[in-house]
A protein has these predicted regions:
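SAM-dependent methyltransferase catalytic-core segment centered on the flexible catalytic loop
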Residues: 7-106, 111-115, 124-134, 430, ...
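Sequence-level detector for compositionally biased, low-complexity segments
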Residues: 52, 74-77, 96-639
């Protein structure tokens, strides 16, 4: 046995060099060997979840330089951090260690096989290896719905959430083939025991039927894209020379301390944020008195949710301040609003994105189309009139109609946004003429274009045809065949926007029946809504989504099942209300988030119940509009 840090390029610590001389002698001997076979189960770790963990990944200068020159350099993704995951480092290290000949056999996280961020890694694999054999064991616990059922158990048990694959990589200098990919996956719905039995039965890749995979030009091995998508105008214009529809866009806001700065109760946001800002400034004083940064952070860990941006501010000894003016409404999850302390300058909003230009403060009037981001497993979009959280949708990216913050750069204290028509447009100069060119002589405004985009993004034809593209890149918008079709999408987009932005103003669904379990004036306070129960297909209890147990007083019946068809961010809109409209306590901070407080701010104790009934209406009306959208026919200019 040899003790070593494999990735450290054989540079041992003082402990190894002074106490384990014999160990180092064996290591030196190993390093002189011509290694041709490497087998292992590398760990999966991309980094700490919070700066409070104080547990950052090690950095390996030489190995990470090789990663940067290969997998990172070849990727088209802007999210390069995931390429420094330990198991991906292991692939890079092993690929170099065997030189120009050998075999690697790894049991690893299977995420790299189809993730958008690993496209460069896959390209390098096909260039460096003659043959690649993949035995996919599924088990991805991060999926939902039917796909989650298909993935079923993980071969490593319930403690692992990542999909697993056995991968063999072969370098053979005598072979004329390069990048041949052979693939086999276990069946759907298999338990852990059934997957292990399948492995035992197959015994070897020599006896296992394999499909040949041919990569596409994007480096995709699975879920390959429709290349006609590239003919359409892209929505995003950053980091590309292509002309785009929007001149600016933003990720949803990433606070890295949601429990502290989001809450149903405005006063709770004030109290918790003040407490944290005061503690941070006290921590600065401790730093000035001689304590090191790590010790200071640990001392104030109960009062400050540390993030890398706030740690950087601490190290630079820059104090923070607090102002109630920075509190505004935010869409935390679909159809679920919260009070947010948004401060892009103080470090207490970890990744503020471009929101100071889109929604500079609570008075700013604007609209933004939110879209699932790159790497999302299922496409969704939703229009908002407030700042959304990063997890509002999956990896939320937002495209604004206007940019009110652009007209007042450097003038925060005198903001006067006026009417939306007076604000700088969010569209590029090329966007409107591009679409007008398809329908000469026909009137099209920027407002038309904005709602047209929203209508197109709801087209079931569009989502199905370009599903693989939408998992791996942000949307592109086609021009439809006729002006009449264009205007049909505009009108649908307007109606959808009215429902989704003004969901609190729609009429509550009137077709339900209320049952009261107690005598007297009912209470509308909510603790945690839950669906009723029925006997499922297998005999076990299943959710009855025609019945809602609102609280101990009220049960709602006759909820139309069709309302469940409207799915946004992998759940029905109603499921989001049931999950989020509750009383919760953050374990780390002890902060209570009571949705009844939000109801009080809205002036109605029954706000949570009315919200549920309104989202029934929103769901039914949305699906009615979506199902009547025109068939997606592409204009000749985009073919």
């Amino acid at each position: 046995m040899i003790w070593t840090d494999t990735f450290a390029n054989n540079k041992q610590s003082n402990i190894f060099s002074t106490e384990l001389g014999e160990n180092n002698a064996r290591l030196a001997m190993l390093n002189r060997q011509d290694i041709r076979v490497i087998v292992g189960n590398p760990p999966y770790s991309v980094g700490q979840e919070s700066a409070n963990d104080d547990n950052q990944n090690d950095h390996y200068e030489e190995l990470d330089a090789r990663l940067a020159a290969t997998y990172v350099q070849e990727t088209a993704s802007s999210n390069k951090n995931k390429l420094y995951d330990s198991y991906i480092r292991a692939y890079r290290w092993a690929s170099d260690r065997i030189g120009n000949q050998g075999v690697i056999g790894f049991v690893t996280n299977a995420g790299w096989l189809d993730s958008s961020s690993a496209d460069g890694m896959r390209k390098c694999m096909t260039e460096e290896f003659n043959s690649i054999y993949i035995y996919h064991l599924k088990g991805n616990a991060r999926t939902q719905g039917i796909q989650r059922q298909k993935e079923k158990d993980n071969v490593f048990g319930e403690g692992s959430r990542a999909p697993v694959a056995i991968v063999f990589l072969v370098k053979n200098p005598k072979s004329s083939d390069y990048g041949k990919i052979y693939f086999h996956a276990v069946g759907d719905y298999l338990t852990r025991e059934e997957k292990l039995a399948a492995l035992k039965w197959d015994r070897s890749i020599a006896y296992t039927p394999m499909n040949v995979i041919v990569p596409d030009a994007h480096g995709d091995w699975f879920n390959q894209r429709d290349d006609s998508f590239s003919h359409f105008m892209r929505m995003d214009g950053k980091k590309t020379k292509e002309v785009a529809i929007f001149k600016d866009y933003s990720l949803g806001v990433n606070t890295n301390r949601d429990a502290w700065v989001y809450n149903s109760n405005r006063q709770t946001v004030i109290n918790s944020t003040k407490r944290s800002v005061l503690a941070f400034n006290k921590a600065l004083g401790e730093l000035n008195s001689g304590l090191d940064t790590s010790s200071v952070r640990q001392k104030y860990i109960k009062d400050v949710a540390w993030s890398s941006s706030l740690v950087s501010r601490l190290e630079r000894k820059i104090p923070s301040d607090f102002s109630e003016r920075r509190i505004q409404k935010s869409l935390y999850r679909p159809f679920f609003k919260q009070n947010l302390y948004f401060d892009p300058e103080s470090g207490f909003t970890h990744r503020p994105g471009r929101w100071k230009y889109i929604f500079p403060d609570s008075k700013a009037k604007n609209l933004a189309i939110c879209s699932s981001g790159v790497g999302s497993k299922e496409y969704s979009c939703l229009m908002v009139d407030h700042i959304p959280c990063l997890d509002f949708l999956e990896k939320t990216q937002c495209f604004p109609r206007w940019l009110p913050g652009e007209q007042t750069k450097g003038a925060e204290d005198t903001l006067d946004f006026g009417e939306p028509s007076e604000m700088p447009s969010g569209f590029s100069q090329e966007a409107l003429p591009h679409f007008q060119a398809a329908y000469p002589g026909k009137p099209i405004t920027e407002d038309d274009l904005f709602y047209y985009i929203y209508g197109i993004l709801h087209s079931e034809d569009y989502r199905m045809r370009y599903a693989n593209n939408l998992m791996k890149e942000l949307p592109r918008i086609p021009r439809v065949a006729t002006y009449e079709q264009f205007m049909a999408f505009v009108e649908a987009g307007q109606e959808l926007a009215r429902l989704h932005v003004h969901f609190e103003d729609v009429a509550p669904y009137a077709g339900v029946k209320f049952e009261y379990t107690k005598v007297g004036q009912p209470s509308y306070r909510v603790t945690q809504m839950k669906w009723g129960k029925i006997k499922g297909k297998t005999g076990n209890a299943a959710k009855d989504k025609t019945t809602l147990i609102y609280n101990d007083w009220i049960t709602v019946k006759n909820i139309p099942l069709e309302a469940q068809e409207y799915v946004v961010n992998k759940k029905s809109a109603l499921d989001w209300v049931v999950e989020r409209a509750c009383v919760s306590i953050d374990k780390a901070s002890g902060i209570v988030n009571d949705f009844n407080d939000y109801a009080a701010e809205m002036g109605s104790e029954r706000y949570p119940l009315d919200l549920f009934l309104k989202i029934i209406t929103v769901s039914l009306e949305t699906m009615k509009i979506v199902k009547t959208l025109p068939k997606l026919e592409i204009h000749p200019l985009d073919k």
